[in-house]
A protein has these predicted regions:
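Cytochrome P450 core scaffold surrounding the K-helix E-X-X-R motif
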Residues: 145-148, 194-200
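Divalent-cation-assisted or electrostatically stabilized phosphate/pyrophosphate-binding catalytic cores
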Residues: 200-209
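… and, occasionally, acidic/histidine-rich disordered N-termini of signaling adaptors
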Residues: 2-184, 226, 237-251
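Short Ser/Thr-interspersed hydrophobic loop/turn segments at strand-loop and sheet-helix junctions
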Residues: 190
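Terminal helices and disordered tails flanking the catalytic cores of nucleotide-processing hydrolases
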Residues: 209, 216, 225-229, 233, ...
Length: 251
């Protein structure tokens, strides 16, 4: 094989890998009639270490996954693909036990990853019939619930990042959601966006934008757009890490 042929072959493989990764990120329409949701992942390279998925479950339930692998580029993309694959496999055997699910994912990821490779992850199950959100936070930036009255709550219960330790244990948390409440799940690339002076947008910037826009916008998709625009205005679109945001609104 000539050098030119090798370049073409690698380029084709790279495009295929990008397509596969984008296929993992899904927020299909009509997953649940009880929730309005939207998500976006903005990567700094063709392949990245962030991911999100909105998955339909039985009985008007849906799952939200937001993850962030350590590192950047191809290595991070492979790690997050491993996490997503492990999650789908483990879900077949653990049923509704979210703590057991994350423990199984951690075991699989740790066994199949190199040393010091890990990923943070938030996994939440929204029940449309009860309004209850059950979740496990595996070392991830705590998602924020902004209630209709303006009060806020962080979703912190869980355990260590997956793949970091062989025998991590996890705990399940839950919260009762009401009509008009919103959940914001994100990766650190969103809140660590910095301006020219090196100041980070931070959780404060996210909360300010989210709380403000939540009062004047009714659509989750609009909120995602407006929050990314607010971050860009602050950082002048200077992005050094993958940034992901998912918004779920209780209808």
């Amino acid at each position: 094989m000539t050098t030119e042929e090798m370049v073409v072959d690698v380029s084709q493989d790279w495009v295929l890998a990008c397509d596969v990764q984008q296929g993992f990120m899904q927020a299909p329409c009509s997953v649940s009639e009880s929730f309005d949701y939207s998500a976006r992942c903005r990567q700094i390279r063709a392949l990245g270490g962030d991911c999100y998925s909105v998955l339909p479950l039985k009985d008007d339930c849906m799952a939200l996954v937001v993850g962030d692998a350590s590192g950047q580029g191809l290595a991070a993309a492979l790690m997050i693909a491993n996490v997503q694959s492990s999650l789908r496999t483990a879900a077949l055997f653990t049923g509704d036990d979210l703590a057991a699910l994350l423990k199984a994912v951690n075991h699989q990821v740790y066994a199949s990853s190199s040393e010091n490779r890990y990923a943070t992850m938030f996994y939440g199950v929204f029940d449309g019939s009860t309004g209850i959100l059950r979740y496990v936070n595996a070392g991830h930036n705590p998602p924020i619930v902004i209630r209709r009255d303006g009060s806020m709550y962080c979703l912190e219960t869980g355990g260590a990042p997956v793949g970091l330790f062989p025998d991590s244990e996890y705990r399940e948390g839950s919260i009762q959601l009401e009509t008009g409440d919103m959940v914001f799940a994100f990766t650190d690339g969103l809140i660590e966006a910095a301006n020219q002076d090196g100041d980070e947008w931070g959780v404060h910037g996210l909360l300010k934008a989210a709380a403000c826009e939540a009062q004047c916008s009714q659509e989750a998709g609009d909120l995602v757009d407006l929050i990314f625009n607010s971050m860009d205005d602050f950082s002048k679109e200077h992005q050094t890490d993958d940034a992901t945001l998912a918004v779920v609104r209780v209808i």
